[in-house]
């Protein structure tokens, strides 16, 4: 707490410490389906989540084997944007790939 003198009327103001919480974080998750090609999933992970080919392939295999895979953890706005971008790109390419966000 800092004490700040007020020069106009000789009162002393106390500055309250602000308590800021870190923003809520959200996982961006790809969901498996039987129609989207594995290579397309790898390309999506590389393009929208800035992963190298090896990491993107590992995420794709996790999606394929376990039904879901986390691509990254972001603030709400960024996660929402990434979900929208991935789903839009998949639909434009004719694939039913699903992408969702979940609280981390």
UniProtKB/Swiss-Prot annotation:
Q: What species does this protein belong to?
A: Paraburkholderia phymatum (strain DSM 17167 / CIP 108236 / LMG 21445 / STM815)
| Pfam families xrefs | ClpS
From what superkingdom does this record's organism come? Answer: Bacteria
Record note on quaternary structure? Binds to the N-terminal domain of the chaperone ClpA.
Whichever gene encodes this chain, its name is clpS
Identify the InterPro entries for this entry: ClpS, ClpS_core, Ribosomal_bL12_C/ClpS-like
Protein name per the record: ATP-dependent Clp protease adapter protein ClpS
One GO BP = protein catabolic process
Query: What task does this protein carry out?
Result: Involved in the modulation of the specificity of the ClpAP-mediated ATP-dependent protein degradation.
Q: Give the protein family.
A: Belongs to the ClpS family.
């Amino acid at each position: 707490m800092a004490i700040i003198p007020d020069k106009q009327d000789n009162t002393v103001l106390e500055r309250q410490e602000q308590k800021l919480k870190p923003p809520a974080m959200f996982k961006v998750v790809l969901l498996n389906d039987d129609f989207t090609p594995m290579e397309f999933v790898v390309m999506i992970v590389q393009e929208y989540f800035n992963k190298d080919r090896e990491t993107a392939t590992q995420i794709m295999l996790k999606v394929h084997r376990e039904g879901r895979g986390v691509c990254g953890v972001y603030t709400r706005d960024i996660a929402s944007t990434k979900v929208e971008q991935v789903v839009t790109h998949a639909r434009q390419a004719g694939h039913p790939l699903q992408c969702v966000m979940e609280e981390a």
